[in-house]
Amino acid sequence: MVVVLSNGGAVQLPWAGRVDAVLEAWLGGQAGAGGIVDVLVGDAEPGGRLAESIAHHVAQLPADRNFPGRPRQVQHREGPFVGYRYHDAAGVPAAFPFGHGCSYTSFDWTDVDVAGDGTDLRVSVTVANVGERRGRTWCRSTCATSRARWSAPTRS
C-alpha cells in the first residue's frame, strides 16, 4: 500500500512502518495530481527530498512547549534550533530527517574531498548513477563552528 499525502506542513506518521511507501506531495496545485500519477506508475523519478525534518511526535519539538501561547501571540523560543538543527543538538532522531527521500535507482558516492584554509572551503564529490534507471540525487554539505559566541547549532 502506498499512501499519498497532500498537506501544507509536516504531519505525524506513526503508521508509516505498516505501509509500503509514503509519498509526500505537499501542496501540488492544479498540476500536482498528474505529477503524482507519473511518480506512482514509474514514468517519473521521485527525486524530491524532504525540505524539513518530520518528528516521531510533536511533543519532541521545542515549539510544542510554547503552544498555544496567549491569544493572538505565538512564542518562538527555540531560536535557531528548528528542524534538523534541533534534532542534532538535542540528540533526538527524526522519524524522517531533512533530506530524506527515495529513488528508483542507486547512486555511488566516491572521491569525497574537503579542502580549504578554515575560512574558505571547497567540497567535491563524484556521484555516479549505478542503477538501471535514470534518476537524480543531490549533495548536501553542512559546516559547524567551534568558536561561536552564542548558542549555535551543531551543523548549519
Predicted regions and their residues:
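Secreted, periplasmic, or luminal enzymes acting at the cell surface/secretory milieu
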Residues: 6-136, 142-144
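Hydrophobic anchor at the start of a short beta-strand
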Residues: 1-2
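Short aromatic-acidic-glycine turn motif
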Residues: 62, 143-156
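Intrinsically disordered, low-complexity segments enriched in Ser/Pro/Gly/Ala and basic residues
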Residues: 5, 123, 151-155
